[in-house]
Amino acid sequence: MPKYYKRKYYRGNRDKYSVEQTAGTLATDALGDGGTTVVVPTTVQGMRKVKHLTISMAQNTSGTGLFWALVYVPQGTTVNKLNVDEGNMYEPNQFVMSCGIFDVDAGPMRITSPVSRNLNSGDSIALVLHSNTPSTSFSYVVRYAVTLQ
């Protein structure tokens, strides 16, 4: 009978992820623009990895559709407004992680981003909105996994 040798497999240490959850309310301004910081910047040195980003959102008032974008914001830059009239929806477009349209009549919205992002200290992720109805209010819950690398 042949001998079978059991191979030893080496597995490195896995990163320990922390699941963060936040909730809040945001409102659009008189022009219909609004937004919030979903993953806040930190002063801790080192790189953070953010993945499995999920946002649940419901509109508190009746109105029309909503344009949204989930945007990576590097340190030293500011969040721009959405351009829904013509051209690219968000500039610079290489920072857009996910985008779409929210139909109010369809019920609550759930945004899931399959993109994981490495964040340096000072970097953040923001949710940018544009509503055709000004002064609209939204409730949201954000959930994501983060680790320090």
Residue ranges and their predicted role:
Residues L26, I55, V73, V79-V84, ...:
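Extended hydrophobic/Leu-rich segments
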Residues Y17, T77-L119, F138:
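Extended, solvent-exposed segments with strong compositional bias
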Residues M1, L53-I55, I125:
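Short low-polarity hydrophobic stretches
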Residues R11-K16, N118-Q149:
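C-terminal interaction-tip segments
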Residues T61-L66, V79-N80, S137-S139:
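Short, solvent-exposed secondary-structure capping/transition elements
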Residues M1-D33:
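N-terminal leader/pro-regions and domain N-caps
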Residues D33-P74, R143:
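Beta-rich globular "head" domains
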Residues L31-G34, G122-S124:
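Tight coil/turn sites that cap or link beta-strands
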